[in-house]
Every structure is written in C-alpha cells, then in structure tokens.
C-alpha cells in the first residue's frame, strides 16, 4: 500500500473517532424535569400496603386526589386541578395535625405527568404539613396497586 493512502485512511479514522467522542447521550441544553418533592417523600405501594395491613398499626391519612378507585381508608377528593376540589381538599386538612403522615395519590396516569399531584403537594407544603408522601405509581393505580392485590375501599362501588 502506498504511504499516502495509509496516511489518508489514518486521518479518516482519527477524524471519525474524534466526532464520536463529541456526542452526548442526552441532548445539550434541555433541563431535567424537577419536582417539588424529594425522593424520600415517595412511598412505594408495597410500603403503604404494609401500613394498611399491619395489626394495630398507626395509619396515615390518605387522600385520593384523582378520579380512580379509592385505596382502603382513602378520603376521596377528586381531581384537585379542578378549583372546587382543591378547596374541598383544603377544608379536609383543617383539623389534621401538621405532623400527621399524609399520603396523596391520583393513579390516573404516571404520577410524574399527573395534573393533580403537584397542586396537592404544593398546597400541603404551603399549609405547613411536614410529613407528606406521594404514592409512587409509575404507571397508574390499576397496574401499581390493584393488579398486586392491594386493598381497595369496598364501600365504594369500584
């Protein structure tokens, strides 16, 4: 092989490798989605189920802030992205101690895209509640709760 061809091929290889090194796995300039809750404020469905099924356990206050079935013991508020439901939610909070464990869930869709979780969470924070948990439903209530056989409120016609 001629030395010129070897040099040209070497140049092409070096050029191609340098281009590859400049690419990134994530788009540059797009901010990551942030949420008002911290990771330690997420509650796994299995953990809530354990609380609900423990004998003589201290039960949290659970709010269903969506339009899906009620988890056992949940207070059904409805979609809090609707102003009257948000006001009803605030009324329900008036006689609850600020340190009480409160768990909120919607379950209509993945909670990270839910139009109800953030308004409810921010309302709780604004009102001074200190023990807030968001039920981690990455898909929806049906997949992450009901399909696992966790308890629903049987007094409501589900």
Positions of PLM-derived features:
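Extracellular/periplasmic juxtamembrane helices and adjacent flexible linkers that interface
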Residues: 135-158
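Second-shell loop/turn segments in exported
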Residues: 32-39, 76-79, 107-111
């Amino acid at each position: 092989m001629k030395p010129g061809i070897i040099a040209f091929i070497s140049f092409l290889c070096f050029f191609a490798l340098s281009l590859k090194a400049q690419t990134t796995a994530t788009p540059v300039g797009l901010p990551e989605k942030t949420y008002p809750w911290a990771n330690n404020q997420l509650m796994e469905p299995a953990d809530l189920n354990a609380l609900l099924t423990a004998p003589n356990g201290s039960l949290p206050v659970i709010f269903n802030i969506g339009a899906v079935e009620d988890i056992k013991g949940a207070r059904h508020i409805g979609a809090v992205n609707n102003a009257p439901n948000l006001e009803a939610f605030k009324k329900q909070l008036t006689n609850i101690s600020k340190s009480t464990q409160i768990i909120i869930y919607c379950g209509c869709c993945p909670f990270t895209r839910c139009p109800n979780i953030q308004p409810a969470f921010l309302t709780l924070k604004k009102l001074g509640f200190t023990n807030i948990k968001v039920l981690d439903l990455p898909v929806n209530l049906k997949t992450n709760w009901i399909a696992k056989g966790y308890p629903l409120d049987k007094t409501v016609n589900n």
